[in-house]
Amino acid sequence: GFKHLMATFESARIQTAARATGVAQSALELGLGYARERIQFARPIVEFPRVAGKLAWMAVETMVARQLAYFAGREKDSDRRCDIEAGMAKLLAARVAWSNADNALQIHGGNGYALEYPISRVLCDARILNIFEGAAEIQAHVIARGLLAGRN
């Protein structure tokens, strides 16, 4: 019973991590696309250091979240206990999705709030990822409990 339930949580959290990574990637692509198209002071805003820096960090964090989700998935596929790894993947990917959506919205400026721009929907999608399949605080608790038990 309980072991089966925990295995279900592992799978669900890995799936949520994958979904969150997709949302993070979408936010990155939307931010990059808009930054290439938006002209300010006679040049695309992607050429401005702050915008380029945001995009670079979005790409780095998305890659890290993706790799952690892949790692947790491999552990699960190998029938190894991976509640800590699944929790880490879900926690990180959800935070990266939210951060990327927020940064992409910032790149869009006021246009990001307009429903014509998909980033407004991505922002909503990103927010819920920190809540379902265990809130971020629950994920942190699961991870800490595992670390204290010596499972790292």
Feature annotation, model-predicted:
Residues 4-152:
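Alpha-helical interface subdomain recognition
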